[in-house]
Amino acid sequence: MTPQIIPFFFMHQFTYGFLVILLTLLLLSYAFLSMILRLYLSRIYLSK
């Protein structure tokens, strides 16, 4: 590995890590929001 490539390597590692974290957060928030929405809707449905 030449010294010129090392910073790019670290940047790629950082970028991929960031993307993975972002995707995980998106999936978790999507699941969490759908769960909350389902609870809310079922509560409204049952209270009628």
Curated annotation (Swiss-Prot):
The chain crosses the membrane at residues 17-37. GO terms for biological process: proton motive force-driven ATP synthesis. GO terms for cellular component: proton-transporting ATP synthase complex. Keywords: Membrane, Transmembrane, Transmembrane helix. GO terms for molecular function: proton transmembrane transporter activity. Signal peptide: none annotated. Pfam families: Fun_ATP-synt_8 (PF05933). It comes from the Eukaryota. It is a single-pass membrane protein. It is found in: Membrane. The keyword Membrane applies. Belongs to the ATPase protein 8 family. This is Putative ATP synthase protein 8-like protein.
